[in-house]
Amino acid sequence: KCTSLEYKSKPKVINCLVCDLSFVPESSYPKNIETIYAEVQDPTYLLIKRSRYKTFQESLKQISPFLPDKGNLLEVGSYCGFFLDAFKKKYSSWDYIGVEPSKWASEYARSKLQINTRTGTLEDNIQKLASDYDTVVAWDVLEHLNDPLGFLIKINSVMKRDGIFCFSTLDINNWLPKLMGKHWPWLMEMHLFYYKTDTTEQLLNKAGFNILRTEKYIHYVSINYLAGKMIAILPDWLEKPLNIARSVTPQKIMIPISFGDIKLYICKKEKPVGSM
């Protein structure tokens, strides 16, 4: 769970000397990873609902100049439906659908937000989806996949020619992971691949996409949530002052966080490619 405050267990990450891609060896993958995603429940995510909406509203501002006036959108890894809920309020004339492996999260999206959501992975649902989406988005998904190229090719297959694909993922070549090393908060067991801008571009080109723009991905977080993250990774002597800060700061205050270690990519489908 990416909202977890536990960082004690760190994966073994190796770097390919040929392609420069960093990844966790398959032998070190969490056992039954697909079942884990299907069964995951994360009430903490619901507690940070306001900040997630603010984050997705910011993402919409970043991608909006590239979207047509009307169309259909697919979100892969739609989780509890917060992005799609923000999207439908801004783009009421669009059709949209989400795909989410977590049974708990997809049911929340359907029952609480009335978001059209299919349970399962993209591969599970690909035969039931359209093949002409104007836009596909996938926020914080690519690092979780054991076959990122295969995933991108499947994304390509459900999109219109010249369709727009927007996603966020990690940039391990950024200054922050270099500075923090093993204490970098996004170094966690459920993240299998760690990208750099050039390795991400190589994958996208192989999958038939061209990058139109790369930007910093902006997270909005409450002071309380940020302090909790910091307590988990900083020296113990800082725990007391951080807890004091949590206790005296109004919970409604949210701040933008953008160190550049997570990038937002806006891409265009240039050509179809063969299925994997």
Which role does the model predict for each range below?
Residues 149-164:
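A short glycine-rich, Lys/Arg-flanked "PGG" loop and its adjoining helix->strand segment in the class I
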Residues 146-150, 177:
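Short N-terminal helix/helix-N-cap motif within the alpha/beta-hydrolase-1
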Residues 2-3, 188, 248-256:
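Short, P/G- and charge-enriched loop/turn segments at secondary-structure junctions
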Residues 167-193, 198-203, 229:
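Short, glycine-/aromatic-enriched active-site segment of Class I SAM-dependent methyltransferases
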Residues 212-237:
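Conserved catalytic loop of SAM-dependent methyltransferase domains
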Residues 198-215:
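A SAM-dependent methyltransferase catalytic signature shared across enzymes that methylate proteins
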Residues 140, 144:
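A short His-aromatic
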Residues 1-139, 149-152, 216-217, 228-229, ...:
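Conserved N-terminal segment of class I S-adenosyl-L-methionine
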